[in-house]
Each structure stands twice: as C-alpha cells, then as structure tokens.
Design a protein with these regions (language model features):
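Dual-mode signal for accessory low-complexity, basic/Gly-rich regions
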Residues: 262-444
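Active-site bordering "gate/hinge" segments
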Residues: 1-289, 296, 305-308, 331, ...
Length: 444
C-alpha cells in the first residue's frame, strides 16, 4: 500500500459512511511505511520495511456497538467490513456507557510530518548501523541496537459530517554497548521528530563511555540517596504515573488523586511548586495529532501547574455523569525545567548517584503510585561534582509522586520516549533527594 493522500482517504471514508445502514458510523483509516535495521555483536542482523494500512469501522444501532477492520479497499471489501460491523452490533448487548459519535469538529494541523525523516532510505539506515558499530569494534566494545523510522497518515470520519486527515513521521534509535567481558554496559537513545538532528557517530560515544566507565562497579548499601535521573530514567516513572490521571478512577477512590470522603484532588497542591506539565499538540519538538482516539480536538492545556492538579482526564461518559466538560486525552507530556544539562547537575552535586536508565518498572501500590524497578546501563557514584566510580545496579521502590516532592533541581527538558508508554515526552534531568534503593542487582 502507499501513503494515501487526503483526497484518497476521504473518498474511501465517504464510501464507508454511505454504505452504513446503522444509526451512526465512524471510520478510521490509518497507514504507515516503516523501515528498520537491527545490529548485534557488532554486525547487522536484520533489516526490513513494514507496509501496512488498515480501516476500522464502528457502527451503532441504539446503544449496541460493533467494530470490524480490514486491509482491503475495493468496493466489495468496503461493503464487507461495514456489514460485518453491523452484524456484530446487532449481536452485542447494549452498552450502558454508550456515547454517540462526536459532531463535526475543527482541527488545527500540528507539525507531525518531517520531510527529512520521510526521506530515510536503506542507505541511511546502513550508515547509522556502521557509525554505531565501527567505533565500538575499534575500541574492543560490542554494540547492539535498533533503528526504526517511518511515515504514515491517519484519517477519521463519521456520519455526523466530521473528517480529519494528517500525515506523520517517526524516528527512534537505541543502542546498548557492552565491554567484551560483559562487566560494563552503556546505553543511548534518541526519539526525534527530525532525522536531520541525529548524529549516530556522536551519540554512540555516550554509550561507549558509559560502558567503559561502568566496569569494576562497587557495591553501595541500599538506602535513600540523592540521585540525578537522566531524562530517560525519569520518563519511565513519570509516564507510569500519568496513567492514573483519570477523573473516574479518582472519583471512585481508585487513585492517588482520590480525595478522602469522595471526589478528587483537582486544583489541589500535590507536587513541588516547580513541577509544571502541559500537553500541547503543536509543540515544535514533540508534536502529536490534534485529535484523540474519539476524534475530540486536542488543545494546549496544563495538566500540573506549579505543583497543583490543573486537569484530569474526563471521558465523555464520565464528564456527562459528573456535569463536567470533556476534553481530549493528551498525546504528549511536556515537563518544564531549567537550563542545565545532566553534566552540569552532576558538577553541582556533593554526593549522589547518577542513573542512566530505569527499566522493568511495575506497580506495587496504585493508591500511592509506589513503583518498583531496576537501574541499568551505567549507574555512578558522584562525589564533589565528579563521577567517582561506577556502582552496582539497584532495585528501587519509589513513588513518582514522592519523587516530585523531593526535587533539588531540574535541568533542561529533552525529547524522550518511555519504554512502555505511548506518550511523546519532553522530560528534564532531575536531581532528587531521598530516592529509595531497596536492594542490589548483579545485572549490568
């Protein structure tokens, strides 16, 4: 399949809407062409291109809803998918929380498409792999990494006259570097809007340095430490916390934002006053589609403002039930910070621990967002503003809510992607006090 133009996408969606005999019909057409290259043990192992386009049709008879999808787009296929969705809707029980399709909306385009990223070809990917592998091989180090890039489009339409179309690109690179004896490990990751900003031959040096310097790690006693979390390390915890910003879960007593006696903490001070987080689909470095999965127009809005809960995620059903205004679910998380780099935060630290990355983060207690996870790929002891020596990795038990009340200093936000999050994020490196490490890990 090719990337459909706006006119081509609209023609398909118009046919689908016209074919439907249901009370209402919503159709989403999305496609992408993505390329990738994978390398391990200093050799390219796989590369390829994935081309996929899919149409999802949702119809309703009263409060009975059915959805079907297909990846063929001739007239017969379009009729088949519509009839299948209608058959499923007739068989479905009524949805007590059914909400009708949204009305016609107006969307302001966001800059989610980059020409340089869309122009990436196999030669570009091969050069990224070569620029990652060659310096490692020359220094007796072992590189393993993955680059994935792509371009795509999304279009949505419904029987109320709503229509939207926008093109997108994506670029994501990660590389882990190990010493030959496996005792040292370093990592670097880049999630970018514009591939022109990527320099593999420079970024690989970060992972190489950390791999070399993380050998001969010393054991520190578990306990509470001042830490500097690099943006990738902080992003995993913060993105996990944002899953609990549902107004419904807070109102029903299932969230750290639930209020004793009922209700939620909207408007209350929950974090350090330096914590501000917004969603903005038009952010130049971290743009997202200007609509959410229901077609609701996204807007620039504060989620946390000076430590106060400024907005919660109200679904259309819950907003109607509670007498609130529904807003689109955010697609990005943009946290404010200062101007310092991670290195500058290190230079201003008397004693502490630098954490490159956190991983395998899991929930311990949803009422406090207590999380557990591990550090990896470069954990270092800081003394008198300098990296003194590597330390063995830790298991941590920490709540990002407590973490964001123990801020010493915030650095300059950078774009990162969480390992298990769909958010596009701008997160600063952060210096925190009393971060809780509970045990040691022998992994590197």
């Amino acid at each position: 399949m090719s990337i459909f133009t706006e006119a081509q996408a609209k023609a398909i969606l118009d046919k689908v809407i016209a074919l439907s005999k249901a009370d209402e019909c919503t159709a989403v057409l999305a496609g992408s062409i993505s390329g990738n290259i994978r390398f391990a043990l200093n050799n390219v192992s796989t590369s390829g291109i994935v081309d996929n386009t899919e149409l999802a049709v949702t119809v309703a008879f009263g409060k009975r809803v059915g959805t079907a999808s297909i990846n063929e787009f001739d007239d017969a296929a379009l009729e088949r998918v519509v009839r299948r969705a209608e058959d499923l809707a007739r068989l479905a029980p009524e949805n007590p929380e059914f909400m009708p399709a949204i009305g016609k909306q107006s969307y302001r385009a966001s800059p989610t498409f980059s020409e340089s990223t869309a122009a990436i070809d196999p030669a570009f990917r091969a050069k990224v792999a070569a620029d990652s592998i060659a310096p490692c091989r020359g220094h007796g180090l072992i590189a393993a990494g993955f680059l994935e890039d792509g371009q795509g489009f999304q279009a949505t339409a419904n029987s109320n006259g709503n229509f939207a179309y926008q093109r997108t690109t994506n670029f994501d690179y990660t590389c882990t570097v190990r010493t030959e004896d496996g005792r040292g490990s370093g990592w670097v990751g880049r999630n970018l809007k514009d591939a022109a900003d990527f320099k593999a031959d420079q970024d690989i040096r970060i992972a190489m340095r950390k791999a070399t310097e993380s050998q001969e790690a010393k054991a520190l006693e578990p306990g509470k430490y001042t830490v500097i979390l690099e943006p990738a390390a902080a992003a995993g915890l913060i993105s996990f916390m944002m899953n609990f910003f549902s107004a419904r879960s807070a109102d029903e007593g299932r969230s750290f934002l639930s209020k004793k006696g009922g209700g939620n903490k909207l408007g209350e001070q929950v974090y350090d006053p330096r914590v501000t987080m917004i969603a903005d689909p038009w952010h130049p470095d971290a743009p997202v589609l200007p609509w959410d999965n229901e077609g609701m127009p996204r807007e620039r809005m504060a989620i946390i403002e000076n430590g106060r809960i400024a907005n919660l995620d109200y679904s259309r059903f819950w907003a109607q039930k509670q007498g609130k205004t529904a807003k689109a679910t955010p697609g990005n998380l943009l946290m404010s910070g200062g101007d310092k780099s991670t290195a500058e935060l290190v230079r201003g630290t008397q004693k502490g621990i630098l954490v490159t990355r956190t991983w395998y983060i899991r929930m311990v207690d949803p009422q406090t967002v207590l999380l557990t996870g591990l550090t990896r790929d470069g954990t270092f002891y800081i003394e008198n503003g300098q990296i003194k020596h590597p330390v063995k990795n830790f298991r941590f038990n920490e709540s990002p809510v407590i973490m964001l009340n123990n801020i010493e200093e915030l650095g300059k936000p950078v774009r990162v992607a969480g390992d298990e999050s769909s958010y596009v994020m701008m997160i600063p490196p952060m210096k925190l006090r009393d971060f809780t490490f509970t045990s040691l890990s022998d992994a590197v």
